[in-house]
Amino acid sequence: ATGTKTKAAAPAATTAIATATKDWTTVVSATPEGGFRMGNPNAPVKLLEFASLTCPHCKDFHEEALPTIKAKYIATGKVNYEFRNFVLNGPDFAASMLARCQGPTVFFNLLNAFFVNQAMWTEPFTKLTEADTKRLQALPEDQQIAALAVTGGLDGFMRTRGMPRAKFDQCLADKKAFEQLTRMRTDAVEKYKLTGTPAFIINGETQAETFNWATLQP
């Protein structure tokens, strides 16, 4: 009888060891709500972040906190992390569509690239002339984001990160992707009552007055 119990317990013990030693940061997926998730899907803590790629405070959080969160909490299976875009402006729409269009495996690397290089890639958009603005506004609405992205130099930014121009154009022409970003923003405001970025939801509960690692960390 004792031997039978030992054999029955062995698979569970093996699973526990595998879970403890697995690097969960390598496990990524898309969510039905439009986010991208990293980590153990059965983690006891579900951390959802809404952020904008053009938001300086979001950049600060990702540089200051995400390495610690990944190493200490996500990699060890304690936290499942999901990122959802909360788009704030045209350049944010363009960058978000480009970061998202190749799926979750590529997304997190591009997310990091957009945050780390935020000042560099957003600067050209601050220098658009009145003539640039009029030219963009004269285009059909479904062509404006793509034209804005090219005007701001995002084609070059993505080319140096392995995205050919044909794929760049394809990503920015994806109407469903644009609509999904719009839905996520609406969901953030209506469901979670968010008013700014970054914003955090833990196990379904919005964290009030929490905008940085100092106020979020356990």
Regions found by a protein language model. Give the residues of each.
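Periplasmic c-type cytochrome electron-transfer domains
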Residues: K7-A30, L110-F114, E123-K127, I145-G152
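Structural alpha/beta surface segment adjacent to cysteine/selenocysteine redox centers
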Residues: L53, K59-A146
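C-terminal cap of thioredoxin/glutaredoxin-like
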Residues: A1-A13, I17, S52, I145-P218
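Loop/turn elements at helix/coil->beta-strand transitions in domains of secreted/extracellular proteins
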Residues: V45-K46, T76-N80, T105-N109, M163-A166, ...
